[in-house]
Amino acid sequence: MMMMMMTSVVLGPFGNFMIPLMIGSKKVAFPRLEAASFWFTPISYVILLSALWQGGFQSGWTSYAPLSIQQGVGQDAYIFGFGLQGLSMVCASTNIVATIINYRAPGMTWNRLNIMGWSMLSLGFTMILSVPVLIDGLYVLTLDRTCPNFDA
């Protein structure tokens, strides 16, 4: 949970602001994706925090389907907040990867890209590659919550 929250901040508002400055670009590749990733982040934090006041989410550090069969709105808000967080990270990472590849300054070769640029590029590729895992995890959490197979 903590890694997902910190990664979305590093990729989203911070990354979309710092990457054009580091590579000598005037803008990001997709400004609307930047705005979407920026605004999805605080909304998902509010939804995650509101889950605490709506009965709480009692899944612990894991949101595995047998542990997420708790009834109530808290667990649903928790799942929706993490889904929105994942959407924010995918928007930001797509924007960062496209910006680094396409909008570098004319003299900026791959050898001159600093370590923060390389780390953001590798983190962005990793987040894009994790999209099927995110989709599958949300699918399992939302559809298997009401499955009676896990009942004792």
Task: Provide a role label for each language-model segment.
Residues 1-152:
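Membrane-embedded and interfacial regions of multi-pass energy-transducing membrane proteins
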